[in-house]
Amino acid sequence: MIILGLETSCDETSAAVVQNGKVLSNIVSSQCCHTDFGGVVPELASREHERLMVAITDAALSEANITKNDLDVIAATAGPGLIGAVMVGLCFAQSMAWALQVPFVPVNHIEAHMFSPFIEAGAAKGVPEEPFISLTVSGGHTLLSIIGTDLSRRIIGRTLDDAAGEAFDKTGKMLGLSYPAGPEIDRLAKQGNPSFHRFPRALTAQSQTSKSYRGNYDFSFSGLKTSVLTWLQKQSPEYIDRHRADIAASIQDAIVSVLQEKTVAAALCHQINSIAIAGGVSANSALRAAMEKECSRQGIRLHLPGPVYSTDNAAMIAALCELQISRGMRPERRYSTAPFAGMPS
């Protein structure tokens, strides 16, 4: 079975071809037009997707050495995401499927991230034959879920305010780093001291104020953003410039320690021996190192996506479509393109 996947949920235009668990192509075009604005401008994102969609799809088919007539299924992100951006990909995919007379399958973007750590192991073949804890962490979402052997999902924790990826980007902007600031903080933090300043770690055992962390797998990062802003306002520009790497390392340590503590605690509490981390923040080197160290100490298997599959990409869309078909699951026909749409049940 040959599946074309399309991804346009935010500011990456991507098309990929997957056949029997193997990624034949995965073309990703990251939009650079948002840098000057310090964040994604929805209207610009939609127009860029519209401009690039045909060329990116042609490139994916060409790299896979197939033609559009070889396709058996077309899958596309159906949300959550920027509504205009999602609609560009959906309309293109549905029109192409209708013209080729092949099935169209809408795919939930967050759900696709959850299974992205298994793409390199062969998509449908790589998923563990046991329940696992999924930490899906990106610029828009921070979710802890239990994934069953039947691919069922139960969310046990989520952000109460801001996502971890947004905390990286916004605090990085406060430090004068370019957008997206997450990778910039990761790079800069390698030169800094994570113990330079202790920023808050809300709803955790490390919190100096919270009393309600036990058995609570929700996240909160708005307080961290406020704390960083307030602290920076008290420092001189010269001091900030001199210690920029130390500040970046301290911010990163605060975010990573919360993600690591809650994810491992959830696995231990529910007696689950596998953890999968996905989403753009899963590319963060400190998060990977912290999770590898703690999972090794606790005897928990850790699944991480390759760097190319951490950020938004169409291979994960096609791979999840193939996984669902291989398990005999009926494609979801009803979907919501809303930014915070829930996963299909």
From Swiss-Prot:
Judging by the UniProt lineage, the source's domain of life is Bacteria
| Record key words, sorted | Acyltransferase, Cytoplasm, Iron, Metal-binding, Transferase, tRNA processing
Residues annotated as binding substrate are: T136, V137, S138, G139, G140, D169, G182, D186, N284
The kind of enzyme this is, by top-level EC class, is transferase
How is the co-factor bound, per the entry? Answer: Binds 1 Fe(2+) ion per subunit.
Q: Where in the cell is it found?
A: Cytoplasm
- A cellular component term, taken from the record's GO annotations: cytoplasm
Q: Which reaction does it catalyse?
A: L-threonylcarbamoyladenylate + adenosine(37) in tRNA = N(6)-L-threonylcarbamoyladenosine(37) in tRNA + AMP + H(+)
Q: Principal localization? A: cytoplasm
Q: Which GO terms describe its molecular function?
A: iron ion binding; N(6)-L-threonylcarbamoyladenine synthase activity
Any idea of its EC number?
Answer: 2.3.1.234
Residues engaged in binding Fe cation: H109, H113, D312
- Please give the Pfam families that the UniProt record associates with this protein: TsaD (PF00814)
Cofactor(s) required, per the database record: Fe(2+)
What are the GO BP annotations of this UniProt entry? tRNA threonylcarbamoyladenosine modification
Any S-S bridges, and between which cysteines? none
Q: Which InterPro entries match?
A: ATPase_NBD, Gcp-like_dom, KAE1/TsaD, TsaD
Task: Tell me its family.
Answer: Belongs to the KAE1 / TsaD family.
Role played: Required for the formation of a threonylcarbamoyl group on adenosine at position 37 (t(6)A37) in tRNAs that read codons beginning with adenine. Is involved in the transfer of the threonylcarbamoyl moiety of threonylcarbamoyl-AMP (TC-AMP) to the N6 group of A37, together with TsaE and TsaB. TsaD likely plays a direct catalytic role in this reaction.
Name assigned to this protein: tRNA N6-adenosine threonylcarbamoyltransferase
Which species is this record about? Chlorobium phaeovibrioides (strain DSM 265 / 1930)
